[in-house]
Amino acid sequence: MAYSYTEKKRIRKDFSKLPDVMDVPYLLAIQLDSYREFLQAGASKDHFRDVGLHAAFKSVFPIISYSGNAALEYVGYRLGEPAFDVKECVLRGVTFAVPLRVKVRLIIFDKESSNKAIKDIKEQEVYMGEIPLMTENGTFVINGTERVIVSQLHRSPGVFFDHDRGKTHSSGKLLYSARIIPYRGSWLDFEFDPKDCVFVRIDRRRKLPASVLLRALGYSTEEVLNTFYTTNVFHISGEKLSLELVPQRLRGEVAVMDIHDETGKVIVEQGRRITARHINQLEKAGVKQLDVPMEYVLGRTTAKAIVHPATGEILAECNTEMTTELLIKVAKAQVVRIETLYTNDIDCGPFISDTLKIDTTSNQLEALVEIYRMMRPGEPPTKDAAETLFNNLFFSAERYDLSAVGRMKFNRRIGRTEIEGSGVLSKEDIVEVLKTLVDIRNGKGIVDDIDHLGNRRVRCVGEMAENQFRVGLVRVERAVKERLSMAESEGLMPQDLINAKPVAAAVKEFFGSSQLSQFMDQNNPLSEITHKRRVSALGPGGLTRERAGFEVRDVHPTHYGRVCPIETPEGPNIGLINSLAAYARTNQYGFLESPYRVVKEGVVSDDIVFLSAIEEADHVIAQASAAMNEKKQLIDELVAVRHLNEFTVKAPEDVTLMDVSPKQVVSVAASLIPFLEHDDANRALMGSNMQRQAVPTLRADKPLVGTGMERNVARDSGVCVVARRGGVIDSVDASRIVVRVNDDEVETGEAGVDIYNLTKYTRSNQNTCINQRPLVSKGDKVQRSDIMADGPSTDMGELALGQNMRIAFMAWNGFNFEDSICLSERVVQEDRFTTIHIQELTCVARDTKLGPEEITADIPNVGEAALNKLDEAGIVYVGAEVGAGDILVGKVTPKGETQLTPEEKLLRAIFGEKASDVKDTSLRVPTGTKGTVIDVQVFTRDGVERDSRALAIEKMQLDEIRKDLNEEFRIVEGATFERLRSALNGQVVDGGAGLKKGTVITDEVLDGLEHGQWFKLRMAEDALNEQLEKAQQYIVDRRRLLDDKFEDKKRKLQQGDDLAPGVLKIVKVYLAIRRRIQPGDKMAGRHGNKGVVSVIMPVEDMPHDANGTPVDVVLNPLGVPSRMNVGQILETHLGLAAKGLGEKIDRMLEEQRKAAELRVFLTEVYNEIGGRQENLDEFTDEEILALANNLKKGVPMATPVFDGAKEREIKAMLKLADLPESGQMVLFDGRTGNKFERPVTVGYMYMLKLNHLVDDKMHARSTGSYSLVTQQPLGGKAQFGGQRFGEMEVWALEAYGAAYTLQEMLTVKSDDVNGRTKMYKNIVDGDHRMEPGMPESFNVLIKEIRSLGIDIDLETE
């Protein structure tokens, strides 16, 4: 295999046994693809596909005026260029968006002509607001903050059949229901009641008999009965009654008389139940007619009206029960034929017939009125209104849309073959649904499982944005319709008709404040990726936390390979917010698909198919780990498979598909946990969630024991710098990398230079630090998509969330009681868990009623010492070390004029004392914060003079840009001349540049000429002259382009900033705070093993081994067995082996062994002990030495989930590293030097420091603010609150009898207002007595009792 630039420097020993059939797909594809579909930015007008914006426009346009004389048509749209790039948007706090311009055509028809002749056509581009753009990492910058739109998992449109699980009625009878859910529009429900009548609800309103809906659709009673029932035909001749026999229908009945065949042989005796055998005999005998007694008809229901043959009088309506009287009437009238409905109690119930009997309506109009009354209670119904309302409910494309998905699901469910069709319902659709529902009630067919992933689909960003956009357009449509009638008379243009505000507002609201538009979790690269791959069942049109039951939250068999069964939050959202599995993707309908390998006759092919949950149901799917031989045949007699959502075993020839990879079940975060297969699921859940909270450490350290997914996450997260094209590194420093692109990758007419600017010390959403460091050196060769610079939490292009710590599992002096963690001081000294946090502090100068606030260094009543870190503009220097209470930005606010005494006025007049009418409102460092100022940004309103600091910052930025552009030009020029040099070398000159004709060009000749003179050369070959001219023109164009770019940037920098109304100036100060690890910080491993640092011990006191190597961390062994996360123990053992091998390599390097010996040892490490084979032969000796140097600190290993290292392999690794195979060693107590009585498990575990730092949580209150009503101190760090002395604490003091302490707690320390002020004065005077008064709570209590109308007073003695 070919190794990338970083892989060559450090190969991970991989223990996986299964071949990689398919690479893990790009992890952010779900976001990027969806939004790309929505915008269709690159498409030309004729090539727009009917999705996204285009579809939204087409669904609303054309808009036709009420009179029908004018219409507004949609032609196409185009997206402009963004005003600022992403970084500028973040800095300025604006949205990264592009203007949307829509071309519309206004058509005015001639009123006079009969055939709508066109009178006038106007076409114009109309501005329709801004559309936010997605950055290349799948985020949006909205008002300067990075946000993510989370995908939503909602119920797919279509028709669903369900029952109430016997909960509605006390008898426990199952009441079946059907629900037609459209993409937008009214819901239609059919449901059975306990009496087995069918009812309909529209939009969950009052129920009506279902027959009302059928009548409203224009069906008569007879048609309804014909549709739902078959009929029995009786012939009457005189006193005799005979039935046209269909033998199947008699099954299960009791014979009321003997049944004979034509010869007179008795087939069924009277009183016997008719069985399947009898029916077979009847069919064989060919009995067509059956004479029955007259009573046989009684109780049956007529299928058609019975009419008097002579007079035409209706004797009985259809759907009437046959009674004795009716029979006598019929016999008298000499009716010869009666049709009755065929019903029975087993598989053909009389439900629709019964429903028709309770229905009060008798014709279509009455039915429409009944529906109108239900939808609009209290409004008087008219025929037109009722018809319009009913038509708009389900049959109007403007109000109702099933969508392509809905139609597909609908047709599949009711058994049609075609999957396309209209977006609105038809009569037939409604009847088919009712038929299916009745069939299910009759025991044919089953209800749907609503949690099946075939019935839930994913709505991604693009689709949700399109829906919002459509909502905005519909609002515009109403306004446009009204204005269109004026357009014809007043000659308006399209621009005058369309007001873009509602569209812009809808889009802004969606991106800014929708429940699914979330502030990006930017703790580390993994949390970013996970956030973008999240699928939520909450949000608009989804579930709510309170309503969601257990079933929705549970793991469903169809989640396999689509949604991760492990990664979900703990707490109220458990199971509602999920993560996509590693290989999952959505199909065109939004259903999640998982990849499988095709298996034919027991032979596994490399063809891959993606299947949704519906499509995979009938397949027999083998595990990825099923045993195969070299010919890829399944060799086990019985293979473990999944079939019909069950786990079972089948013969190899029955298998049709096979999993692609063992990690296709889990999400990205879970696939980063080594030995996941040995952890309990609950702890694995905590492990995946805690990796997302890891704070990037100062120096990232790759995990010694990983899973091989680290590289994918780091590459796809976008925090690393990835080469766009291959080439040679031209120059590299801390802030930029310049690549000279390979000739074969250069497009014609461009420079072939890629410049990558690195992000330095920037604040993330979670205040962690984003910083990139180059990995490459000048002259290195890189290929396309190699990683050239590490970002936060990445080490050589691999995700590195924590540090490898030497740990021992042992109870030690009680310091690690109950999950506490004991650390060595060495961890702090080496800055292993030191993190940098960047805080943004903002100072806003506003225009107040009393005058403008001013940012200045001239602050009243502040000593010189407090101002020594400010410049003349009153803003702190970059690089200043500041602590709590220091002034960062000096600001004064005008104070209201106070009434002055005449003496003061006189003094004012004499001394010109102005300082007293302003108050100090400077920005100070918040309490408990200490750090370094790393950056200052000043934003000034247009028209306000900029201060010296703002000008200095602007000059610095301009210099930076100029330097960048000059550098770019220098490289472009260099590259161009290099190419010319290789083309001209050895060619003959025709003259020019002071050279004689016939001179042959060599390097010396060219070095003797200045670059400008090269273009004066006339060569003998015309092609070369042309190349010279092109090169000259290219350089001139490039210079012009760069100058334009500079001017553009300069203009942007110099224009005023768009600030909120009333704001004159904003100063942002960025503080970098360094946090070392300390007691109280939360740490965790990757297996859900979390704890709090309890103590940091001196190195010399820590337990150490026989060589004197102390351990870094002591963990409690009692935390392992009950929690069943044994993965951490295996990780510890393998980590020890990895470290041991590294030390062995280090010794070999120190002894200056030859490269050949190193090669032999490395081959042994990588290829002798199981797992994937590495090809070390393609490495040169230098590369082998470089590799060995990078392995000194430990050989990194990969044990992929469900396909990892086996116990024997771990033992073999330990043996190879000359370490005990048990993974245990004898330790000595650092304090006493005594040996511990039994060997202890020692090894290396990857530990994370989580973003729950004691510095952010702990605070102390002196005197602070009080609650207005109760006068008690507030709570919480943000309010500078106190600790609540609660009910139980009061009981504790009562139990001790500590009366005075209790009195102090409940009075002067809480809400005795006078007492606490006195106390304060007393303490200041050095007098420590207290005089408790009445707590304010009593007054509150009295007021509450008075509010109940009881007058109560406290008597004072």
Curated annotation (Swiss-Prot):
Keyword Transcription attributed: yes
One GO cellular component, as annotated: DNA-directed RNA polymerase complex
InterPro entries (alphabetical): DNA-dir_RNA_pol_bsu_ext_1_sf, DNA-dir_RNA_pol_bsu_external_1, DNA-dir_RNA_pol_su2, DNA-dir_RNAP_su2_dom, DNA-dir_RNAP_su2_hyb_sf, RNA_pol_bsu_bac, RNA_pol_bsu_CS, RNA_pol_bsu_protrusion
Keywords: DNA-directed RNA polymerase, Nucleotidyltransferase, Transcription, Transferase
Any one GO MF annotation of this record: DNA binding
UniProt-listed SUPFAM superfamilies: beta and beta-prime subunits of DNA dependent RNA-polymerase
EC number: 2.7.7.6
Domain of life: Bacteria
An example Gene Ontology biological process: DNA-templated transcription
Catalyzed chemical reaction(s): RNA(n) + a ribonucleoside 5'-triphosphate = RNA(n+1) + diphosphate
Subunit structure, interactors included: The RNAP catalytic core consists of 2 alpha, 1 beta, 1 beta' and 1 omega subunit. When a sigma factor is associated with the core the holoenzyme is formed, which can initiate transcription.
Entry function: DNA-dependent RNA polymerase catalyzes the transcription of DNA into RNA using the four ribonucleoside triphosphates as substrates.
HAMAP family recorded: RNApol_bact_RpoB (MF_01321)
Family statement: Belongs to the RNA polymerase beta chain family.
Name of the featured protein: DNA-directed RNA polymerase subunit beta
Native source organism of the sequence: Pseudomonas putida (strain GB-1)
Lineage: Bacteria, Pseudomonadati, Pseudomonadota, Gammaproteobacteria, Pseudomonadales
